[in-house]
Curated annotation (Swiss-Prot):
InterPro entries referenced in this protein's UniProt entry, alphabetically: ATP_PRibTrfase_cat, ATP_PRibTrfase_CS, ATP_PRibTrfase_HisG, ATP_PRibTrfase_HisG_short
Organism of derivation: Pseudomonas entomophila (strain L48)
The protein, known as: ATP phosphoribosyltransferase
Domain notes: Lacks the C-terminal regulatory region which is replaced by HisZ.
Main location group: cytoplasm
Coiled coil (residue ranges): none
Gene behind this protein: hisG
Amino acid sequence: MLTIALSKGRILDDTLPLLAEAGIVPTENPDKSRKLIIPTTQDDVRLLIVRATDVPTYVEHGAADLGVAGKDVLMEYGGQGLYEPLDLQIAQCKLMTAGVTGAPEPKGRLRVATKFVNVAKRYYAEQGRQVDIIKLYGSMELAPLINLADKIIDVVDTGNTLRANGLEPQELIATISSRLVVNKASMKMQHARIQSLIDTLRNAVESRHRG
């Protein structure tokens, strides 16, 4: 049995057509089903529907053989028990710092609000910058507006939400897309099956990119 961990939303919607190229189609619509384990048209493949931030945990610990996760999630997770063999080139966006539009660069210790705490620590450590990191789970844009933080670190797609709240994107930390991740033990135990799937997905991505 091959178990693939996916999260609902944009990543799931963009991943399903790629899996279909490999003949893997869920027998129920994951967006409408309440089931968290969904069979597919291949008897030996099932889908696990989990939170986006939990995908690498399920894969690293072997509860899933493969998964699809955003590079932002993988950067924050930082686990070592994963292979990352393929950039699926879907759900593309940017991980950036942002601050109040036109505000001067803060002097001294910087206050940064983000849910990407580990990413923020590494980013500012590389700059040698002293920071206080404030963990938030949502509505990041509020933090600079109410003086909770000087800057935020968040995923930016169009930047419209930032601009609507008087903020501007500033420094690019990473360009983000969704990646296929594979459990290391599964890759050894089911190498032929998983490698075949990786190759099929790679061909589908390249074909879509050429098109």
